[in-house]
Amino acid sequence: KVVWRYLIDHGWDETCGGGVHWRELNEHTTSKHSCSTGPTAVMGCKMYLATQEQEYLDWAIKCYDYMLDVLQDKSDHLFYDNVRPNKDDPNLPGDLEKNKYSYNSGQPLQAACLLYKITGEQKYLDEAYAIAESCHKKWFMPYRSKELNLTFNILAPGHAWFNTIMCRGFFELYSIDNDRKYIDDIEKSMIHAWSSSCHQGNNLL
């Protein structure tokens, strides 16, 4: 609850029309990022599930809606990195930093799944499916594993931590529909990594 209070009291403000600042600096930041607003939505859902206190759900929806309204690329349902203030009115969103990273879409995917679980509203599940499909298309690639003698879609090279956070969204979706479409590729990626890159002396990859 202390962390949550800090996020809401100091992370969210009306710069860029809302959203959560992404880090602390000696000088005040102005941009709003997917990597901070998305996790706040997820945390709000989890705090609501733990406490049933409406404030958490209200903020989770507020953060999620901001992500869709300001930071989402509507053409593929994935999320841009951040938005900077409008030059004429800093309380409006301005220029977007349009790089896309896997974790920036994985957190709103997880939030959409959690909001569906909480509210039962189909729009959240529909959005979760759209995000998941685009994540799979962008951050997985066809691969032939000699070690496994299998062809599958492997997690593409990139930042392992980013991909781990993306996978949380796939796991949350799987907990709803039990469809192994994405889980199978994640599992095979991990088994391939273990089979091909495990250090025998310490079992680290």
Specify the residue positions occupied by each region the protein language model found:
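Well-ordered alpha-helical segments within folded domains of soluble proteins
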Residues: 1, 32-48, 97-117, 157-174
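Structural helix-adjacent loops and short alpha-helical linkers that scaffold large soluble proteins
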Residues: 1, 47-62, 74-75, 113-129, ...
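Extended ligand-binding groove/face enriched in aromatic
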Residues: 1-47, 57-58
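Amphipathic alpha-helical segments of tetratricopeptide repeats
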Residues: 8-9, 49, 65-69, 117, ...
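CBM-like carbohydrate-recognition segments
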Residues: 10, 32, 130, 134-205
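Acidic/His metal-coordination segments adjacent to aromatic residues that form catalytic metal sites
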Residues: 22-26, 82-96, 139-152
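Ligand/cofactor pocket segment of small-molecule handling proteins
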Residues: 42, 67-102
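Oxyanion-binding "anion nests"
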Residues: 101-119, 124-140
